[in-house]
Swiss-Prot record:
One of its GO terms (cellular component) is cytoplasm. It is found in: Endoplasmic reticulum membrane. Its main location: endoplasmic reticulum. The chain crosses the membrane at residues 52-72, 75-95. One of its GO terms (molecular function) is enzyme activator activity. It is a multi-pass membrane protein. This is Uncharacterized membrane protein C23A1.05. Keywords: Endoplasmic reticulum, Membrane, Transmembrane, Transmembrane helix. It comes from Schizosaccharomyces pombe (strain 972 / ATCC 24843) (Fission yeast). It holds the Pfam family SPT_ssu-like.
Length: 101
């Protein structure tokens, strides 16, 4: 048997595999248009639809941020208690008194 033949893509087709950032952005916008059907809208309808989508995404992010900010102190306190709980738990399994350590 001979050596395997390796076929490399031409330079013209490299952008298909590794698109430039702007091409990638255009591709994502095209996918959004096709998925949501906004390519059928007029410019005004598309503007209103995109504005509503933007507001919904913004408000969802805002709500998630406010929930995370409220939960963060209690999660931080919980994360500081977990190691001491496991330390005392494993010490009790080993039969050692955790208070003497």
């Amino acid at each position: 048997m001979g050596n395997p033949v390796v076929i490399k893509a031409k330079k013209d087709y490299d952008c298909v595999f590794e698109p430039e950032p702007m091409s990638w952005l255009r591709l994502q916008y095209y996918r959004y248009q096709v998925t949501a059907g906004t390519y059928l809208f007029t410019y005004k309808e598309a503007f209103v639809f995109n504005t509503v989508v933007f507001i919904i995404v913004f408000l969802t992010g805002w709500a998630a941020k406010s929930i995370i900010v409220k939960l963060l102190p209690s999660l931080w306190r919980l994360s500081t208690l977990i190691p001491s709980f496991f330390a005392s738990f494993f010490m009790s399994l080993l039969g050692k008194d955790a208070s003497s350590q």
